[in-house]
């Protein structure tokens, strides 16, 4: 083998690392040193030349290309792509989301109830304020019935009770929702009325037939009708009888039965009389508090008692001025009496029989004579009271008097005033 033979060694490497030229030179020198003895003893004429160093291709599944420009810049690497890099990039992004284990189940904000059951007024697909309330989506529910829309009351052509208009802003729908849930309608709390104080003015006008009671006294004023020409006034300064009130004159057409008001346990009855117009031996007595009316089958009279004198140290003056009512329906007998009752334990009745004055003409409403009857000194007080009590009883038991008392004539067309005739002197002597 001549010295002209030359051997070329080719180093094949398949790594990604850069080839170190120093290592290659040293390795080539070592290999040439080993091969020199062989060249000296061999006659072979084979020549080995190292033409170029070829590196292995890079697998795409282990290396991600940054860009197409980077692949073109690498002269040593030749990469063949099996698919479109853009699609690969989208697939990779989807795979990355799956690797994070994040599952989107809903959305937040104004349309949070779009994918979940919701009442009609919260629907995101059909806005409650801008669309018809009759429309609904797959997730809409009735706010009142709490069932999937439409409910039986969804749209029944009555706008006030259609459940499609229900919302959580009005009180009526809240009450109906509570009624469907519990079975009873909630009631509103009742408000208590505020107490108010009514103040009556002090200066008030007294109405007709109204009785005014003054403190520490008993005063009664009765206003008679306009046809009566006189006033009936009674004053009694008794402090404990403020509750007593004199009754006004009853209607003459409605009086039928005899009423005698007395209470023997609390007071003693005193007959107030007026003696006038005596004819012959008889004495005519007119009673102020007795109104006698006679019809075709009955007659009635009313006698009002005096007030109760509890304290004997007080003085009572009773003055009565009464006149006869003109008319054809009734006869009203008037009386004027002056009684002075004084004493501390005993009462004195003074009757003056000597002052009896017979009237020359019949009494009328305009012409009335008065007389004062004083008890004679020989007559006892108890006897007089007994006689008066018997007279009361007789009047009450005999509504249609006969005998000494002349019955009243039937009412006629003419105006008249008749009297009750009674023998008072004979009655006292009995």
UniProtKB/Swiss-Prot annotation:
Keywords: Hypersensitive response, Nucleus, Plant defense. This is RPM1 interacting protein 13. PANTHER family: RPM1 INTERACTING PROTEIN 13, ZGC:112980. Residues 1-21 are annotated as: Disordered. Interacts with RPM1 (via its NB-ARC domain). Binds to ARF1 in the nucleus. One of its GO terms (biological process) is cell death. Residues 231-300 are annotated as: Nuclear localization.
